[in-house]
Structures are given as structure tokens and as C-alpha cells.
Design a protein with these regions (language model features):
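Asparagine-centered strand-capping/turn motif at beta-strand->loop junctions
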Residues: 47-51, 165-173
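N-terminal signal peptide c-region/cleavage motif recognized by signal peptidases
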Residues: 17-19
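Intrinsically disordered, low-complexity Pro/Gly/Ser/Thr-rich segments with frequent PxxP/GP/PP motifs
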Residues: 77-110, 188-213
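Surface-exposed binding patches on compact interaction domains or structured appendages
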Residues: 27, 50-98
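Short, solvent-exposed loop/turn segments enriched in Ser/Thr/Gly
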Residues: 38-44, 98-100, 114-118, 161-163
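Beta-sheet-dominated interaction scaffolds and their linkers
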Residues: 23-52, 91, 150-160, 195-198
């Protein structure tokens, strides 16, 4: 039989996962890099090979334009001079048990509104040593990078139409909405509501179980507040 290799790359979109996710033989220290104002404009992602074979890793940055809206697009970020984002190194070779870091850094001034990037960190095919047909399955991470403005604003507008709640981020930075809750008129039946990252200019609609007030917590980085709609 002729030797051949079939390589499949699968992407796990794990931007909302907690730190320390593991897929196959590659472990990342974090899957969200939040470059907040007042903090150093850089952060590191540690990549760890916890398998017993050498792995080859690539880190490819993309810019997400109009995130969270119907006009959302994804485009290669280009050079650091073009994109304002440095990702280095973009190629790694990790021996079994080896750990390396990928630096994510803002180049230049902070933007007036969020800039959103994804960095696809994934194993790539190396030499195939199998003497028969081989199937290699690689799973990578689409890590999220948020470049925040110098003066983030946190406005969210809420509108109710019957049991439809519409939320719109009218500020200049993404907010995480979580711990949503609504109770019936008696207060005896309370329901948890879904979480959402709401980007600037984005709108989110959901159908509520009741007609009563809704509460959410929202966060920008470590700062949180309660909101009522």
C-alpha cells in the first residue's frame, strides 16, 4: 500500500473557557487576553506539550471587524505595523514536556473603541513516520484578544417589548453579561438567564420567561456592576 498521511485540523472555539484548557497534547495557560487600560499593553500565553511526541505549533492572528453584529468579518491581521498587534513567535517546536510562551502585545496607541482579534494557536503537521496510512487529528484554540480603549465607557441600553428583551452596547468596549435572573410576580419561581459578551454596537435579543424585572451583572475586566432592565 502506498504510504500517505491524512491530516485533519479541528478548531475548538474556547474563548469562554477557563484558564488551563487541554486538548489532546497541547495545553494553553489562557484563552482570553484582555489588554485593559492602566495595565501593561502585553500579556503572554504559555503553550505546553503534555504529550510524548514533538509537536509543531503555529500562532496566526486575525482581526475581527464589527464583532457580534451581522456585518462581522474575520481577516488576517497582517504585520504588526499594519495591525498594531504583535504575536511572537508565530512558529514553535515543542519537545515532550516543554513549555514556551507566545507574547501578545499592543503596538502604538490605544484605539478609541475596542479592537478585537483572534489568534489561532494550533498544532500543525510535522513528519509522518507511520509505515501505513496515517490519520493525524489536531485540535487548536481560537484565542480571543481584546484591545481596550484608554477611556472605556460602559453604557448598555435595554428595551422591553412584551417578553422580548433587547440589549444594545452603546459604549466603546465589550462587556460580559452574566448571572442573569428573572422571577415571576410572586418571587417563588426564579430562572437563570443566558450569559453573553456584548461588543460595542452589538445588539442582543432574548425571550424572557416572565414579565417582571430582569437583573444582570456586567463586567469590564475585573470591575462588575448590577444592571436592571
Amino acid at each position: 500500500m502506498t504510504r500517505k498521511a491524512l491530516t485533519i485540523t479541528l478548531f475548538a472555539l474556547l474563548a469562554l473557557a477557563p484558564a488551563g484548557p487541554a486538548v489532546g497534547e497541547m495545553v494553553l495557560s489562557q484563552v482570553i487576553v484582555d489588554l485593559l487600560p492602566g495595565k501593561p499593553p502585553r500579556d503572554d500565553i504559555e503553550v505546553w506539550n503534555d504529550g510524548d511526541e514533538r509537536i509543531y505549533v503555529s500562532a496566526e492572528p486575525f482581526e475581527i471587524r464589527a464583532p457580534g453584529t451581522p456585518a462581522e468579518t474575520r481577516a488576517p491581521a497582517g504585520t504588526p505595523e499594519e495591525s498594531g498587534l504583535l504575536v511572537a513567535p508565530q512558529r514553535l517546536i515543542l519537545e515532550p514536556g516543554e513549555r514556551r510562551t507566545i507574547r501578545i502585545a499592543l503596538i502604538g496607541e490605544r484605539p478609541p473603541s475596542d479592537r478585537v482579534f483572534r489568534v489561532a494557536i494550533k498544532p500543525v503537521a510535522g513528519p509522518v513516520s507511520a509505515s501505513t496510512d496515517a490519520l493525524k487529528v489536531f485540535v487548536g484554540y481560537d484565542t480571543l484578544v481584546l484591545v481596550r480603549p484608554e477611556g472605556p465607557t460602559s453604557e448598555i441600553e435595554g428595551q422591553r417589548a412584551g417578553r422580548t428583551l433587547t440589549l444594545r452596547n452603546t459604549g466603546n468596549t465589550a462587556q460580559e453579561l452574566f448571572d442573569g435572573r428573572q422571577c415571576d410576580a410572586s418571587g417563588a419561581d426564579c430562572r437563570a438567564l443566558p450569559a453573553k459578551r456584548l461588543y460595542p454596537g452589538a445588539t442582543w435579543k432574548q425571550i424572557l420567561p416572565f414579565d417582571a424585572e430582569v437583573t444582570y451583572r456586567s463586567s469590564i475586566g475585573p470591575e462588575t456592576r448590577e444592571r436592571r432592565f
